């Protein structure tokens, strides 16, 4: 794996993905073997948007590797409030850190920022663009529950603005899976994502406006929330809010071994009654963020002159 920055899942080959997932499995099996590998190594966290799981799991991952973090904190308490540009911010903070993690509301921000720094930069979400590290933990969760071959996967919810969807759907083209996309017409996959899937990867894009008909076929159902904060018009959000609500009754038509995933946070798209069923994997999915991000940091930092891979 030879990547200076992790910006989109399109960068990642099947071999790259398997390298990260295999390393994550090693960490899961024996975390102590990776403790203190990166003593005196510092990870810079630059989050221009709210985050719970991504930010805390990167923080935990770096500390469990023996390193530490520097955190820009909220935008309101940083020099961004004074008008500092993103380019200047990352140039300054790379002087304090050995790698950077960036979340930003603007699509393309991570790519732009990476052009101004020499340390590795990992995209933790750029608006409605990409979220490649979430994709890696999603793939790890899928592999742990169902393998990554000969699967039928449904992806449901906000497919237009959902960066987790854009990244995951592209990464899945590296594996033998059928993908079904379930959304209101107004929230269908962006045409550039459809182009990547169909024209560049040869993936058939199957679009549905209801999940009931396709549910019995699915091995994995990946649910996303309707993202209120991405809508330019509140009235447009209200038209689709609550469009899909998965309940235990729906699961009577599903396969016994269906795995239900969600990048979280959820609103009302998965009923709490599903949480304690064998289908629910979304909390496991969130917890997988730590070993997967430990694996990614280990591989990126070692490639950048840290600990050599054995």
Swiss-Prot record:
InterPro entries in alphabetical order: Asp/Orn_carbamoyltranf_P-bd, Asp/Orn_carbamoylTrfase, Asp/Orn_carbamoylTrfase_sf, Asp_carbamoyltransf, Asp_carbamoyltransf_Asp/Orn-bd
Documented EC number(s): 2.1.3.2
One cellular component term from this protein's GO annotations in UniProt: cytoplasm
Enzyme class: transferase
Alphabetic keyword roster: Plasmid, Pyrimidine biosynthesis, Transferase
The keyword Ribonucleoprotein belongs to this UniProt entry's keyword annotation: no
HAMAP family: Asp_carb_tr
Family in the record: Belongs to the aspartate/ornithine carbamoyltransferase superfamily. ATCase family.
Descriptive protein name: Aspartate carbamoyltransferase catalytic subunit
Annotated source species: Halobacterium salinarum (strain ATCC 700922 / JCM 11081 / NRC-1) (Halobacterium halobium)
Organism lineage string: Archaea, Methanobacteriati, Methanobacteriota, Stenosarchaea group, Halobacteria
Name of the gene: pyrB
């Amino acid at each position: 794996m030879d990547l200076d920055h992790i910006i989109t899942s399109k960068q990642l080959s099947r071999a790259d993905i398997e390298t990260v997932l295999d390393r994550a499995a090693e960490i899961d099996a024996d975390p102590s073997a990776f403790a203190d590998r990166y003593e005196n190594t510092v990870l810079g966290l630059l989050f221009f948007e709210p985050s719970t799981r991504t930010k805390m799991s990167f923080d935990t991952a770096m500390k469990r590797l023996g390193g530490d973090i520097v955190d820009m904190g909220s935008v309101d308490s940083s020099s961004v409030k004074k008008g500092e540009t993103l380019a200047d911010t990352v140039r300054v903070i790379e002087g304090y850190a050995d790698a950077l993690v960036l979340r930003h509301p603007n699509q393309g921000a991570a790519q732009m920022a990476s052009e101004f720094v020499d340390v590795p930069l990992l995209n933790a979400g750029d608006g409605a663009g990409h979220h490649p590290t979430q994709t890696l933990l999603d793939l790890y969760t899928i592999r742990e529950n169902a393998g990554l071959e000969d699967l039928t996967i449904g992806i449901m919810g906000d497919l237009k603005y959902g960066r987790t969807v854009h990244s995951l759907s592209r990464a899945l083209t590296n594996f033998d899976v059928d993908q079904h996309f379930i959304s209101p017409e107004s929230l269908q996959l962006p045409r550039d994502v459809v182009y990547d899937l169909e024209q560049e990867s040869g993936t058939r894009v199957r679009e549905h406006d209801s999940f009931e008909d396709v549910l019995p076929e699915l091995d994995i159902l990946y649910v996303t929330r309707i993202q209120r904060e991405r809508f330019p018009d509140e009235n447009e959000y209200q038209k689709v809010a609550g469009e899909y609500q998965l309940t235990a009754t729906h699961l009577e038509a599903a396969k016994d071994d269906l795995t239900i995933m969600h990048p979280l946070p959820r609103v009302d798209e998965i009923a709490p009654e599903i949480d304690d069923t064998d289908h629910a994997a979304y909390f496991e999915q969130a917890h997988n963020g730590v070993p997967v991000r430990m694996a990614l940091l280990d591989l990126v930092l070692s490639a950048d002159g840290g600990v050599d891979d054995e």
